[in-house]
Regions:
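Positively charged n-region of N-terminal signal peptides that target proteins for export
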Residues: 1-5
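Cleavable N-terminal signal peptides
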Residues: 6-7, 17
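Extracytoplasmic copper-binding redox domains, predominantly the cupredoxin/blue-copper superfamily
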Residues: 17-107
């Protein structure tokens, strides 16, 4: 019984599999919120299309990490895991010129 209680408590209080939520198009603006992110190696970032579609995430010099498919629907979401230490600049391809750019610090 104690094992079952411990298991259920662990599942109930389990954290999401990602480290950070990032809103794409936050508050009606062409921005990532937050735009500067600190995570540990192996952690994931959860990107959510908040509004003003379409959005995607291109990670500079890392096509294997990029999510180039466009998220058209508000609420559409995806995760990107960053396995190695380093600084990763990312942007939304359709809105890079408008300043929709961010950076991930993995350490």
């Amino acid at each position: 019984m104690k094992f079952l209680f411990t298991l259920l408590a662990t599942l109930f209080f389990a954290l999401p599999v990602w480290a950070v939520d990032v809103q794409m198009g936050a508050n009606g603006n062409l921005v990532f919120e937050p735009s500067e992110i600190n995570i540990a190696p192996g952690e994931s970032i959860h990107f959510v299309n908040n509004m003003l579609p379409p959005h995607n995430v291109v990670v500079e010099d890392h096509p294997e990490l990029s999510h180039t498919d466009l998220a058209f629907a508000p609420g559409e979401e995806f995760d990107i895991a960053f396995p190695d230490e380093g600084d990763y600049t990312f942007w939304c391809d359709p809105h890079k010129g408008a300043g929709m750019i961010g950076i991930v610090h993995v350490s």
